């Protein structure tokens, strides 16, 4: 499943899935389903076309789309994971360098490990409990929580510079493997 607005494309390019984003307010998204698992190993390879702008968020979610873990590539070349209200650094990425990410998740214990390019796995705890996971999401921006129930009915402002594209950020997903663990 993909979400691909005009300035946020999801397309195949050089045998990879490429997400590009030059929209100041929207994002590109690709979502892949896999067999429901309480314990799972997920491996994927990506290349970021830049390390000085753009954002890529990767989430494992349950069947209703509730995420339990999030890995982020930020605009400073850092790879982070969400740890409660804070973010924890996992390492750095470089523009145009392929990286392999391996995640092993145990939904029952809420613990997961992340390994970058075969490095020693870093232990982490999920920021939200889920019974199982069955989707991985790649998104070029933050999830939207606006408008919500508290948003005024009549809006008296417009978003600033919606007609001006920002510097294009590109991310290529080379492959994705999932495996249910015993």
Segments from the language model and where they lie:
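Secretory/extracellular carbohydrate-interaction modules
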Residues: 7-79
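Short strand-turn-strand beta-turns centered on an Asx-Gly dipeptide
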Residues: 115-119
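Short, aromatic/His-centered strand-loop micro-motif at the edge of beta-sheets
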Residues: 80-102
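Short structured motifs
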Residues: 26-31, 84-89, 159-161
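Flexible glycan-contacting loops in extracellular carbohydrate-active proteins
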Residues: 124-174
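Short tryptophan-centered beta-strand motifs in secreted/extracellular beta-sheet-rich domains
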Residues: 44, 96-107, 112-114
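Extracellular/lumenal carbohydrate-interaction signature centered on repeated Trp-anchored short motifs
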Residues: 31-42, 90-97, 167-172
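Short, tryptophan-glycine- and acidic/Ser/Thr-enriched carbohydrate-recognition patches
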Residues: 1-4
